[in-house]
Every structure is written in structure tokens, then in C-alpha cells.
């Protein structure tokens, strides 16, 4: 299912302007041998030899003075995540409600704001509740997540990749922790990566 065209498309769609992950590899470095790198990545994914590298922890300041931790994946991991997204997106996209905007094709935060504004204008609403759900990801039960995936994702390669990402660690100041939590979630989503 994953072929060279999928790999090239995944690379094309991956943001390449972000900071490098723990390997220090930039887009320019990776592109120096792009076809060979993508062929090697494809072979490792399909054979099960792909190892999800730890993400590099980085903090960004928030408006309230606190810091938001991010996990910065390697460029190659972003490409691997993107190729799996390309496979899963058509499977799950039809399940989403029209009022859902997060990380969906053809939708943006600006679209969500426009819909919110239109709803406020037509309904005469006056309140907005701002909720930060970032801590929610700390509580996701991986067994439940795997059960959810079991219902529609039967491809062993895809399942193994997801399991590897769920177990990937975090590198902070030279210290490796065993598991990613939302407190150190990978930067956004493959679409943002």
C-alpha cells in the first residue's frame, strides 16, 4: 500500500521549516539524498524495522506567562507520520461532524472562527468559553485507543507504526524518558508537522 509515490507525497506535504528533531537533520540535509532516504524509510516502515525516535522537548511561552511543552519530532518521523495520515484520513474523515475543524483537510482555525462568528450572529449568543484540553491527552487509555483502531484499521504495518509512536520517548536536556504524554506531545499533528 505504501509506495514511492506515497512517500514523495508525504514528504511534499510535510512542513520542513521547523526546528530539527534529536538527530539534527534539516530538510536540506534530507533532500541531499531524498529518493534514497525515502526508499530506505519506506523499506523500514514496510518491514517493521522503523524505530520511532524520541521527540525533542522544547518550551514556548504562553500568554499567561506559563510555558507550553512541545515535542519536536525528526523530519523523517514527520514524513512517516504523514504517510500514515494519508492512509488513515480517508478512513476516518467521513466520521467527523461538519462543526469539527481541528486538523481536517480543507479546514483551518480561521474557518472555525468564521463559523463561530456566524453562529454568534445568527443565534445572538454572547459568551465564549475557552478550554485548554491539552492535559486530556495525558489520560488517553492506549488500550481503548487500540480497540478503537481495531474496528477499522486492519493493516499490520499501520498498527505497528502507531504503537511505536505511542511508546516513543522524550529527550529533554540529554535525559530520555520512556513515554510521550500530552505534557510533551509531539508538535501539533502530522498536518502541522
Residue ranges and their predicted role:
Residues 5-8, 24, 28, 39, ...:
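Non-catalytic, well-ordered alpha-helical scaffold segments
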Residues 67-96, 183-193:
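Conserved pre-motif C helix in the palm subdomain of viral-like polymerases
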Residues 2-18, 55-59, 85-91, 170-173:
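Short, compositionally biased low-complexity segments
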Residues 1-5, 78, 90-91, 139, ...:
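Residues at alpha-helix boundaries and the short loops/turns that link adjacent helices
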Residues 20, 25, 67, 131, ...:
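Single, functionally critical "micro-switch" positions that shape active/binding sites
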Residues 1-47:
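Surface-exposed loop/turn segments and immediately adjacent short secondary-structure elements
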Residues 37, 44-59, 63, 95-193:
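Conserved polymerase palm-domain catalytic core
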Amino acid at each position: 500500500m505504501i509506495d514511492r509515490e506515497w512517500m514523495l507525497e508525504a514528504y511534499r506535504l510535510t512542513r520542513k521549516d521547523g526546528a530539527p528533531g534529536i538527530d539534527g537533520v534539516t530538510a536540506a540535509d534530507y533532500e541531499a539524498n531524498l529518493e534514497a532516504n525515502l526508499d530506505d524509510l519506506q523499506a523500514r516502515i514496510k518491514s517493521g524495522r522503523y524505530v520511532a525516535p524520541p521527540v525533542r522537548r522544547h518550551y514556548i511561552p504562553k500568554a499567561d506567562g506559563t510555558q507550553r511543552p512541545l515535542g519536536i519530532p525528526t523530519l523523517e518521523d514527520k514524513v512517516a507520520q504523514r504517510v500514515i495520515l494519508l492512509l488513515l484520513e480517508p478512513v476516518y474523515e467521513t466520521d467527523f461532524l461538519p462543526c469539527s475543524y481541528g486538523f481536517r483537510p480543507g479546514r483551518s482555525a480561521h474557518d472555525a472562527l468564521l463559523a463561530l462568528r456566524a453562529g454568534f450572529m445568527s443565534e445572538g449568543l454572547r459568551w465564549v468559553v475557552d478550554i485548554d484540553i491539552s492535559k486530556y491527552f495525558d489520560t488517553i487509555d492506549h488500550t481503548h485507543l487500540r480497540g478503537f483502531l481495531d474496528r477499522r484499521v486492519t493493516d499490520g504495518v499501520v498498527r505497528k507504526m502507531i504503537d511505536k509512536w505511542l511508546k516513543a520517548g522524550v529527550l529533554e536536556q540529554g535525559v530520555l524518558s520512556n513515554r510521550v504524554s500530552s505534557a510533551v506531545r509531539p508538535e501539533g499533528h502530522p498536518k502541522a508537522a
